[in-house]
């Protein structure tokens, strides 16, 4: 049967092992390894053992698509864990749903991960273990308005990231609803390292604070 080789059941790990978000993938793999070890030690699968087959997304959506195809077609895994980046989960989702193989993302928060934005139909083989962008954006807007007491916001996002776009959208909607004003919106690209000119432009708009829904490398 698919994913079963004798006494071994193969699970796919579609993870960011290299690239800009490698910290997510590496820590995720460590967690999966530990979980599989404990499951195997308990012997809850009737004597069968789980093994992890990893495909590296290289922190790129296109590579996630290739990796999903490999895990399903070549490695014959029974299910896939990952990726962590929303853009990568969305890109690879058509493959696992088409093949009727379950995928679960630990960190893919964009609503489009589990719901087709065009048809509004739930993707039957895509799942997540985390909250979603509407929740995060709403909470951040509430925190900015009610706790920080700020009125003028700048939004600075990674223009290549569905994660960043989703958070920015829901933050803006709720911040404005709370009586705030978004005075400027700017964007950077993944792997950018020089932000001085844009930050100078943002400073000139005189925001009370800057909302940057991005990944750790560029934000740091």
Language-model segments: what does each one mean?
Residues 208-220:
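Short, intrinsically disordered, charge-balanced linker/junction segments flanking boundaries
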């Amino acid at each position: 049967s698919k994913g079963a080789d004798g006494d071994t059941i193969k699970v796919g790990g579609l993870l960011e092992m290299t690239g800009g978000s490698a910290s997510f993938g590496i820590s995720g793999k460590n967690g999966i390894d530990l979980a599989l070890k404990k499951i195997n030690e308990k012997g809850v699968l009737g004597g069968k053992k789980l093994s992890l087959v990893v495909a590296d997304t290289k922190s790129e959506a296109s590579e996630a698509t290739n990796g999903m195809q490999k895990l399903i077609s070549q490695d014959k895994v029974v299910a896939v864990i990952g990726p962590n980046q929303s853009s990568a989960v969305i890109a690879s989702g058509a493959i696992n749903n088409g093949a009727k193989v379950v995928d679960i993302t630990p960190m893919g928060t964009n609503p489009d991960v589990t719901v087709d934005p065009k048809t509004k139909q739930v993707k039957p083989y895509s799942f997540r273990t985390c909250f979603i962008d509407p929740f995060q954006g709403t909470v951040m807007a509430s925190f900015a308005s009610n706790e920080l007491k700020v009125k003028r916001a700048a939004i600075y996002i990674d223009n290549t990231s569905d994660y960043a776009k989703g958070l920015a959208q829901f933050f803006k909607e709720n911040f404005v609803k709370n009586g705030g004003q978004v005075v400027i919106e700017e964007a950077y690209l993944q792997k950018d390292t020089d932000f001085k000119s844009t930050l100078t432009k943002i400073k000139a708009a005189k925001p009370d604070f800057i909302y940057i829904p991005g990944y750790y490398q560029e934000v740091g």
